[in-house]
């Protein structure tokens, strides 16, 4: 809740503050403030599965592009953004960027993110990430897996992460597989 403003036709009726309106001769509506200063970490699995091309571009490149766009929006909204890349061990952890002027720093760091021929170690990577985060964060995890064993290991690691953080798991859809 930020402030009260005079109700105008077309506003959502659920925003009317009936107690404040009862004290005056006009209707007043609540104005809510957007949450700011959230910590968002874009985590990238740089393992072998992320090298598979989707429409001619590796999955990791599509993930990085999507994350940079979302990071720019988050920075404009007043949130803090970091990048984290891993394969068999953590490879990249940027400090949190705090405003949109720092987006070039994130772009430079993102340019170093590339896939490797190694299998990802979700347990080590996500435990390292958890240890580095001092407060509750939103973690957007870009990954893909081809076999049930990898999926189980990833789910176990994410379960531990979810105890303290919000986690969104993102995969890049392959249109060719969807058509089958």
What are these regions (language model features)?
Residues 102-138:
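Von Willebrand factor
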Residues 19, 115-119, 147:
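Short, flexible loop segments at the rims of nucleotide/cofactor-binding pockets, characterized by
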